[in-house]
Amino acid sequence: MARRTVLVTGVNGFIGSHAARAFHGRGDVVRGLVRQGSDRRLLGDLPLDLRHGDITDRASLDAAMPGVDVVVHLAGLASDHGPWERFHAVNVVGTQLLAASAHAHGVRRFVHVSSASLHGFAGRRHMTEDMPMPVSPYAYVESKRQAEQWLWQWSQTSGLPTVVIRPGNVFGPDDHTFLLQYVAAIRNGQGGYIGGGRAWTCPTYVENLTAALWLAAEHPAAVGEAFLVTDGLDIDWRTFTERLCEALGLRRPRLSIPYWLGMALATALEGGYRLVGARRAPLLTRYRIQNGGRDYHFSIDKIRRVLGFVPPFDLATALQRTAASMATARPAAPGAASGDAVG
């Protein structure tokens, strides 16, 4: 069978670099879209066909697209802080330009990585793909919602074969954003829980996610469908944190604040940061408080049933691998942008 050429946007980011390894390991030719001068350390010596480009620049996308069979779209602005205009330009318009270029060049499948956060923080467990995706007060979430909504309409009119993946809270080796910040806070005695850590969460180990991405790019039944992807666990934040601390050899956090207090503090902090025009997010944001203080949990029954997905790594292995990578890692600034789409 002829080898496919898979274009991965955001290839030098956390999820993108893992996706590149996964597709290369299965025999695909991986073409990576990277911005000029961007950090490529996560790619190591992986043999890739790197192309300079930007998802907001149609000409650069057209230059990278000839010969591509599958697009895996991971590039985006992923942060809980920043102006709407930036999120719209990158996450909405960038997706539109990429999909249009893929269609113009005869791409056979377009795998769009969205976010489980589109379903909101409704305090529910076992949420499914057909549940509402309300307008969000958070620029990141709303931009991903609008991008996915547009993409479904475009795929119907253009005929572009499209699959959407909505991951939960992604973690794993080389994650220098949220999880590393959380661990740094625990090390410093500042980490803790919202409401005692009893809200259910949706850990999504990055190599489990890339296994789902491969199925989305390969399985004939995937086209035209959206799939939620997590590790499939019924787990709360306290249990996840305790398992994480055990893997890292850290003392478990003892601090906890009520949900209402967390929201009040986050609202005040965000208002103050906006007032002074701060570019970085405060340590507490409403997004983070809702993510950690309300049930935010999803069923993966659909992807199990339709694509035969089974998460290949259990939580113990995932945390061991993640802990090993954190020995020398330094956290990014709070609210830092990422080359990946995250939950």
Model-predicted segments: where are they?
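Catalytic helix-loop patch of NAD(P)-dependent Rossmann-fold dehydrogenases
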Residues: 89, 123-170, 191-195
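Conserved Rossmann-fold NAD(P)-dependent oxidoreductase catalytic core, especially the SDR/UDP-sugar
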Residues: 93, 97-139
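A conserved pocket-lining segment of Rossmann-fold NAD(P)-dependent short-chain dehydrogenase/reductase
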Residues: 132-134, 164, 184-204, 208, ...
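Glycine/proline-rich active-site loop of Rossmann-fold NAD(P)-dependent oxidoreductases
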Residues: 145, 158-160, 171-181, 207, ...
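Conserved C-terminal active-site "lid" loop/helix of NAD(P)H-dependent oxidoreductases
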Residues: 206, 242, 265-274, 279-309
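Mid/C-terminal beta-alpha module of Rossmann-like enzyme folds, strongest
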Residues: 215, 219-283, 316, 320-323, ...
